[in-house]
Amino acid sequence: MTRVALTSAVNLAKKLQEAGIRHPAVLKAISRTPRELFLDNALAHKAYENTALPIGQGQTISQPYIVARMTELLLQHQPQKVLEVGTGSGYQAAILAQLVPELCTIERIKGLQIQARQRLKRLDLHNVSFKYGDGWQGWPNRSPFDGIMVTAAAAKVPEALLSQLAEGGVLIIPVGEETQQLMRFTRRSDRFSSEVIETVKFVPLINGELA
């Protein structure tokens, strides 16, 4: 990580702290992660702006505030094993991999998955398992998970993901179509409590279609 990138990442973390992010480990991970690595060169100059940016294939790299907020919500439950649905650029995975012992991540667009794997390897993050597949179905063979994070908006909550939560596990997911709400579901035996966190805007979670 260059000195300029490090300074920019540290400044981004400070902006996120001012915006309400409080978890010190999340802020530290943001400050150590070169976001420009996850963007095309043409957009690298925008890497440390607090905004979502296109990454091709109709997908985006999420706004840093949302990355930090979702991570903070997940870490409140101290997960040991996490599933990320929607690897995308790999930036969210890079943040999570610094904060949890084991991360599994699924992507339905092969080209994005290949790029993300290469980027995390460059950052020496080796506690991540990758899967090319339909995120709606989760990763049954690797379940249960203490935490599941979905980085695209589902029209409804996928039952498969709820079923793959461990006891006490949490699902962080944007739900809705035109109007989306970031929600947290917590498993208690065979029951699930739900909590609306805030209004958000994500690309849609596509069901069953690989690219």
From Swiss-Prot:
The protein's name: Protein-L-isoaspartate O-methyltransferase
EC number: 2.1.1.77
Record field: transmembrane: none
Disulphide connectivity of cysteines: none
Compartment(s): Cytoplasm
Catalytic activity: [protein]-L-isoaspartate + S-adenosyl-L-methionine = [protein]-L-isoaspartate alpha-methyl ester + S-adenosyl-L-homocysteine
Pfam families named in the record: PCMT (PF01135)
Gene Ontology terms, MF aspect: protein-L-isoaspartate (D-aspartate) O-methyltransferase activity
Keywords recorded for this protein, A-Z: Cytoplasm, Methyltransferase, S-adenosyl-L-methionine, Transferase
Cited SUPFAM superfamilies: S-adenosyl-L-methionine-dependent methyltransferases (SSF53335)
Active site positions: S62
Keyword Cytoplasm: yes
Enzyme class: transferase
Function: Catalyzes the methyl esterification of L-isoaspartyl residues in peptides and proteins that result from spontaneous decomposition of normal L-aspartyl and L-asparaginyl residues. It plays a role in the repair and/or degradation of damaged proteins.
Family: Belongs to the methyltransferase superfamily. L-isoaspartyl/D-aspartyl protein methyltransferase family.
Gene Ontology cellular component list: cytoplasm
Gene responsible for this protein: pcm
GO biological-process terms attached to the record: methylation; protein modification process; protein repair
